[in-house]
Amino acid sequence: MAFHGKDDVLDIKAQAHVWKIIYGFADSLVLRCAVELGIVDIIDNNNQPMALADLASKLPVSDVNCDNLYRILRYLVKMEILRVEKSDDGQKKYALEPIATLLSRNAKRSMVPMILGMTQKDFMTPWHSMKDGLSDNGTAFEKAMGMTIWEYLEGHPDQSQLFNEGMAGETRLLTSSLISGSRDMFQGIDSLVDVGGGNGTTVKAISDAFPHIKCTLFDLPHVIANSYDLPNIERIGGDMFKSVPSAQAIILKLILHDWNDEDSIKILKQCRNAVPKDGGKVIIVDVALDEESDHELSSTRLILDIDMLVNTGGKERTKEVWEKIVKSAGFSGCKIRHIAAIQSVIEVFP
């Protein structure tokens, strides 16, 4: 191919950029393939880098074509999940990059359930209906699946468990940053309810870090039924739109971004009724968007916003929107603090 000037070079770069966007799903599904094959765990359990043939012999599939596997591994190297090292005899061997610790099934902060859950076919299908979700009468998920995401999860126990395990993995990463970056926020609190707390990962971490706090896990009855049986933590099933157990503090971690502003205000009003006017607070852990920021996490936050648009009808919010819905729910105001996470802490006061 002959280039005839700057415009041709720019055109090729533009084409390459669009091709990369078109095949953006390749990253997700190559990652899923690697998880299904257990590539990270196989290399990790080997305790040293592995040659192509050795790795092929350990895979849970028969008749592995080593050239096909090589191409998958080459892509994982490009994704910075694996790296290539050469042995003394010049043989290529594959080792794990630091990010791979999140891709091990047995890792404390494993993202494997989230990867498997978000890339399974039923959760990919609604993305094809994104344009149908632009109206006010249902999300893309509802248009594609004929039900809300919550109805789907309630009717598909295996997917619900995978979803909650995925959220638990996310929670371990987030809660560590929450506690280390906001210890002062929990001082003086004697009781706390984790609303929509899933299997109890967050409330257990808070209880372990602050044993003086009487902690309660609150979620839908079918979620509570599958939650951990945790010592010193009361478990209550219910509906946060109808009532919330009383406590000095309520925590809503990755909850309100699932709901539109109107529903979020309804939830916040129930939380306001559950905390004392003097000394009470609601702790929201969610993204606080800065639309003008070029921070390295900004693009991830915008991806999460589109995820909410497609699947839940919720949204990630700017500081201004957080202040608006908090006051609409009857609170006096809020304070936003940033922690070492994609999300921020929005501390809300009666």
Swiss-Prot record:
Metabolic or biological pathway: Alkaloid biosynthesis; (S)-reticuline biosynthesis; (S)-reticuline from (S)-norcoclaurine: step 4/4
Documented EC number(s): 2.1.1.116
Residues that bind S-adenosyl-L-methionine: 196, 219, 239-240, 253
Family: Belongs to the class I-like SAM-binding methyltransferase superfamily. Cation-independent O-methyltransferase family. COMT subfamily.
Assembly and oligomerization: Homodimer.
GO terms of biological process kind: methylation
Entry's Gene Ontology molecular function annotations: 3'-hydroxy-N-methyl-(S)-coclaurine 4'-O-methyltransferase activity; O-methyltransferase activity; protein dimerization activity
Reaction equation(s) it catalyzes: (S)-3'-hydroxy-N-methylcoclaurine + S-adenosyl-L-methionine = (S)-reticuline + S-adenosyl-L-homocysteine + H(+)
Active-site residue list: 257 (proton acceptor)
Protein name: 3'-hydroxy-N-methyl-(S)-coclaurine 4'-O-methyltransferase
Protein purpose: Catalyzes the transfer of the methyl group to the 4'-hydroxyl group of 3'-hydroxy-N-methylcoclaurine to form reticuline.
UniProt-listed PROSITE patterns: SAM_OMT_II
A matching Pfam family: Dimerisation
Keywords: Methyltransferase, S-adenosyl-L-methionine, Transferase
EC category: transferase
Lineage start: Eukaryota, Viridiplantae, Streptophyta, Embryophyta, Tracheophyta
Database matches in InterPro entries: COMT-like, O_MeTrfase_dom, Plant_O-MeTrfase_dimerisation, SAM-dependent_MTases_sf, WH-like_DNA-bd_sf, WH_DNA-bd_sf
